[in-house]
Regions:
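A structural helix-start
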Residues: 13-21, 41, 45, 102-103
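Acidic donor-binding segment of Leloir-type glycosyltransferases
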Residues: 25-69
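Conserved nucleotide-sugar donor-binding catalytic segment
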Residues: 85, 143-239, 243
Length: 287
C-alpha cells in the first residue's frame, strides 16, 4: 500500500504464560509492518508481566505495556477499553493472548480496506486450533455464518448469532477503523464475570447496527481451543441462559437510547426474547 496506516493491536493478558510470547511473536512476524502492539496487563503474575516488559525493551516505540491502577484485575472489556484509550492507530485489531496470527493477516485485511473504502470493519474466518495440545487432532477452518461479501446494517444482526443462526466472528479475526469505535463506543464493561461470555456480542451488535462490514472467508488467525476457556462455560446451561437474558436486557436498554434505530432490530429483539421464554419451558434446550 502507498500510504500505510498504523494498526493498533490490543492484546489483554491474564496469566497466559508462554502463550503470550507466541501471540506477540506472531504479530512481529507480520508482513505488514506499520503497527503498534499494546499489551494490557489485567493483573497477571510477575513472570507474565516480565514477558511483556521484555518486548517493550526490545521494541521501544513499537510495543507498549499498560496495567490497570494498582495492578488490579478488571476483566477483558475494561482491559480492551484501556487499550483503546492508549491506541494511536487509524485501525484497531484485537488478539487474545492465547491466540496467534498467520504472517499475512494484516496484509490481506489492509488490502481489502484499500479496495473497499466504504467498509468500516472486516471480519474473517478462524482456524480452530486443536493441534497445539494434541498433534493428532485435526484443526479446522470455521467460516463466519454468511457468504463472503459486503453487508449493510442491520443485516448481520439478523443473520449471525445470537439473534441469527450463523457463526459469529472471533475477535482475533476482526479489524476495524478507529473512527467507528469513536462513533459507536468501545466495549461494554457491564459484561464482566459470567457475562463476559457475551462481551464481544455486545460490541459487535453496536457495529452491526450502523456500519458497513465485509465478511471474508480467509482464515489468517489461530483460535486456540481449550476446555478452560470462557466460551467453554456456554456448556453450562444455566449460566448460558442467564447470560442470554442479560444480553437481551442490555440490547433493549441500548436501543432505547437510539430513537432513530432501524425498526427491524426491534422485531429481531422481540423474537429473541420469545426464544428465551421458550427455552425456560423446555429443559435442556438452548436457542
Amino acid at each position: 500500500m502507498n500510504n500505510q496506516p498504523v494498526v493498533s493491536i490490543i492484546i489483554p493478558f491474564l496469566n497466559p504464560g508462554h502463550w503470550l510470547t507466541e501471540a506477540i511473536e506472531s504479530v512481529l512476524a507480520q508482513t505488514y509492518t506499520s503497527f503498534e502492539i499494546i499489551l494490557i496487563d489485567d493483573g497477571s503474575v510477575e513472570e507474565d508481566a516480565a514477558i511483556a516488559l521484555k518486548y517493550c525493551r526490545r521494541f521501544p516505540g513499537k510495543v507498549f505495556y499498560y496495567m490497570h491502577e494498582s495492578h488490579v484485575n478488571k476483566g477483558l472489556t475494561a482491559s480492551r477499553n484501556l487499550g483503546l484509550a492508549k491506541a494511536r492507530g487509524a485501525l484497531i485489531a484485537f488478539l487474545d493472548a492465547d491466540d496467534c496470527w498467520m504472517p499475512a493477516k494484516l496484509t490481506e485485511q489492509l488490502g481489502l480496506f484499500e479496495t473497499m473504502p466504504e467498509v468500516q470493519m472486516i471480519c474473517e474466518a478462524s482456524l480452530f486450533w486443536y493441534s497445539w495440545n494434541d498433534p493428532e487432532k485435526e484443526n479446522n477452518i470455521v467460516q463466519i455464518g454468511v457468504p463472503s461479501g459486503v453487508y449493510t446494517p442491520p443485516q448481520l444482526i439478523k443473520l449471525l448469532y445470537p439473534f441469527g443462526e450463523g457463526q459469529p466472528p472471533c475477535p482475533t479475526g476482526i479489524i476495524i477503523k478507529r473512527e467507528v469505535i469513536d462513533r459507536c463506543g468501545g466495549f461494554e464493561e457491564s459484561f464482566s464475570g459470567i457475562y463476559q461470555l457475551y462481551e464481544d456480542q455486545a460490541f459487535l451488535f453496536k457495529i452491526y447496527s450502523t456500519e458497513i462490514i465485509y465478511i471474508s472467508n480467509q482464515a489468517n488467525n489461530l483460535y486456540r481451543k481449550r476446555e478452560d476457556s470462557m466460551s467453554s462455560s456456554a456448556n453450562n446451561l444455566e449460566v448460558y441462559n442467564t447470560v442470554r437474558k442479560f444480553y437481551a436486557n442490555w440490547v433493549e436498554g441500548y436501543l432505547a437510547k437510539i430513537p432513530d434505530h432501524n425498526p427491524i432490530i426491534d422485531t429481531l429483539l422481540t423474537a429473541f426474547k420469545k426464544s428465551l421464554v421458550y427455552a425456560e419451558t423446555q429443559p435442556g434446550i438452548t436457542l
